[in-house]
């Protein structure tokens, strides 16, 4: 199918956060700014709910990244880095 794009599979990533839970560094690269953040809360009615806090980050190396904190298992993942 043309025009469709496959979503990037999330991969585990090391994130250092501040006291409020906002990312300060992704792997070894510092975060310059948080462009946007949002929460996805889905499948709450099932045995495997999905609850994630997403962050679109601007890194000090000039790249953008989208990461999320899985609020169910406590781990961090990169959706786009």
Describe each region flagged by the PLM.
Residues 1-81:
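Non-catalytic peripheral regions of nucleotide-handling enzymes
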């Amino acid at each position: 199918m043309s025009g469709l794009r496959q979503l990037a599979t999330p991969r585990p990533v090391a994130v250092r956060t501040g006291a409020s839970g906002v990312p300060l560094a992704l792997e070894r690269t510092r975060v310059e700014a948080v462009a946007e953040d949002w929460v996805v809360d889905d499948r709450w009615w099932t045995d495997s709910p999905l609850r994630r806090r997403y962050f679109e980050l601007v890194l000090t190396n000039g790249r953008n990244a989208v990461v999320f904190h899985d609020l169910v298992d406590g781990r961090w993942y990169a959706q786009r880095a």
